Amino acid sequence: MSRARAHVVVSGKVQGVYFRSETRDQALALGVTGWIRNRTDGTVEGVFEGDREMVEKLVRWCWQGPPAAEVSNVQVEWQDYTGEFSGFKIAF
């Protein structure tokens, strides 16, 4: 099993639409660890770790987000897996 880490920044109408909580729910269902947070510039940022296939699924999900979201871009930086997370949290 190949492990992966993705640092993502999601742009568009992504705050105030339950993007963070829905991403957490998706991550937990996929067995992906990490965090997600709102940024002051209106984007949402996250770090996802786990099985490469599951991390890729979560990144693809970010392109749609929850029903009220209007995603315009998902920036992804693939990084080395660290295994530093034990769960998935909404960071503040």
Curated annotation (Swiss-Prot):
InterPro entries: Acylphosphatase (IPR020456), Acylphosphatase-like_dom (IPR001792), Acylphosphatase-like_dom_sf (IPR036046), Acylphosphatase_CS (IPR017968). One of its GO terms (molecular function) is acylphosphatase activity. Residues 5-92 form the Acylphosphatase-like domain. It holds the Pfam family Acylphosphatase. Its EC number is 3.6.1.7. Belongs to the acylphosphatase family. It comes from Pelotomaculum thermopropionicum (strain DSM 13744 / JCM 10971 / SI). Disulfide bonds: none annotated. It catalyses: an acyl phosphate + H2O = a carboxylate + phosphate + H(+). Keywords: Hydrolase. The active site is at R20, N38. This is Acylphosphatase. It is an enzyme of class 3 (hydrolase).
